[in-house]
């Protein structure tokens, strides 16, 4: 794990964790800014639990919103968030991001740069964690990250593969063996 960010330790401990880079060129400059995103999905008793960690590698523009958009109806619950506890006179607001969900999406967000330049954005060299439960397969959702400081682009897509890291989805992992028989193992 030497010379890698801490987010890679999660994948070393759990090989089902998917890590992707979210790169973009900010404005007309040639500077590539990068976020790293990792996702873990588990399935138990008809409910998917998704955990997402996002690390700001070098983006001065920071991030202010994460959106998971499902293609259809989903029952979404137990959304959570973990951030950095700023201290020692840091000017950044310590306010947790707001969590909002409806029938086909869940989002976490803080104020825009225009409202509060010191809002609790996902700033350079920090990592925030987000999680939720859903009845719809979260590997089929589209994930996007809105940037905090104004500029182009204003949002970037997180390129998770769309492939489910869940190996078995036939109901047996829940302990329900009612559809199993000796003729059809």
Where are the predicted features?
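Short beta-strand elements of extracellular/lumenal beta-sandwich folds
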Residues: 38-60, 64, 70
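Extracellular carbohydrate-recognition regions
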Residues: 166-182
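Solvent-exposed beta-hairpin/edge-strand motifs
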Residues: 63-94
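Edge beta-strands of extracellular beta-sandwich domains
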Residues: 154-162
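Low-complexity, intrinsically disordered segments enriched in Ser/Thr together with acidic residues
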Residues: 109-141, 147
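Short, exposed beta-strand/loop patches in secreted or surface proteins that constitute
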Residues: 41, 94-102
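Low-complexity, acidic Ser/Thr/Pro/Gly-rich terminal tails and inter-domain linkers that flank the onset
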Residues: 2-45
């Amino acid at each position: 794990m030497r010379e890698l960010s801490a987010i890679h330790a999660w994948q070393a401990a759990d090989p089902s964790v998917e890590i992707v880079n979210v790169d973009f060129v900010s404005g007309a400059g040639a500077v590539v800014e990068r976020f790293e995103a990792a996702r873990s999905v588990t399935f138990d008793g008809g409910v998917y639990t998704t955990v997402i960690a996002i690390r700001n590698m070098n983006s001065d523009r920071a991030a202010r919103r994460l959106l998971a958009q499902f293609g259809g109806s989903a029952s979404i619950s137990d959304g959570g968030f973990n951030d950095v506890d700023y201290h020692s006179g840091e000017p950044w607001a310590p306010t947790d991001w707001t969590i909002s969900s409806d029938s086909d999406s869940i989002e976490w967000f803080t104020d825009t740069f225009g409202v509060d330049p010191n809002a609790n954005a996902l700033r350079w060299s920090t990592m925030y964690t987000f999680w939720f439960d859903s009845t719809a397969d979260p590997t089929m959702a589209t994930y996007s990250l809105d940037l905090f400081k104004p500029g182009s682009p204003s949002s970037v897509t997180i390129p998770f593969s769309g492939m489910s890291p869940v190996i078995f989805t036939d109901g047996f992992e829940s302990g329900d063996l009612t559809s199993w028989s000796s003729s059809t193992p």
